[in-house]
Amino acid sequence: MGTGWSLLCYGPAALRPAPVQAAVQARLDALVAELSHWGSDSLLCRFNALAAGEGLDLPPDFAAVIDVALQVAAASGGAFDPCMGALVQRWGFGPPGQPDARARAPLQAWRELHWDAPRRHLRQPGGLMLDFSAIAKGHAVDCISALLVELGLPHHLVEIGGELRGQGLKPEGQPWWVDVEPPAPDCDLPALRIALHQLAVASSGDYRRFRIDEQGRRLSHTLDPRTGRPVAHGLALVSVLHESAMWADAWSTALMVLGPGQGLALAESRGLAARLVLREAGGWRQLLSPALRALLEDEA
């Protein structure tokens, strides 16, 4: 997935870290073998290479990701799209290498996918390139959290590429308190400090990956699937809290694409706990959804 991972967990005194680390790495390797768009031998890349009309019967992880991705795509009016691989490459934000000459980058590409959820069968309409970079890390966080519970380690904090999930409590009875990273060193807004107790947080923004074009304009790596271009509003960072890191991951991207007005409206209508940070001429401003305000009040 092109990123690193870390975890903190508490267990019995006899716990040996090495077997836990090995089990976590094996689970992550299996996910990468299915969901990664880095390289050419993953299941995702094999789907991208299928001819029109061909399909795959998907294993559970891949099926779970595409199912949630298409739900968020529909609920957001196409602001989230798992079929942006070709578009991302054309803007220079994808993996290194030459893009597939057969790849297409139609707007609202997700609508062309043929997904049979009961059969877990996905059919390639021809030339579409899946890219799960806005959802796969969240799913991996959920999977590792579930694995740790299976290993008898229900008290843990998992982080993959900046997406986090906390489960259980620390030994002193406190939840896992985390501070969400600010969008820039000069951001003077108070830190978003939250307790991750059976809760995940994921963020999307232009503060890490962007480039400057020939006119000196800042181009966000977040692309709008509805226009095929980088988003051009003032949002610098969106953070979403959810029981599932996968859902938080996808929703944060959708809200980032929609912008402050439509993004906050969607968060309110879906009951999402979201923080939207805007970069403005006079400094920084934040918008908090009602669900996040209620959550922060409960923690105060």
Predicted regions and their residues:
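Mature catalytic core of soluble alpha/beta enzymes
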Residues: M1-A300
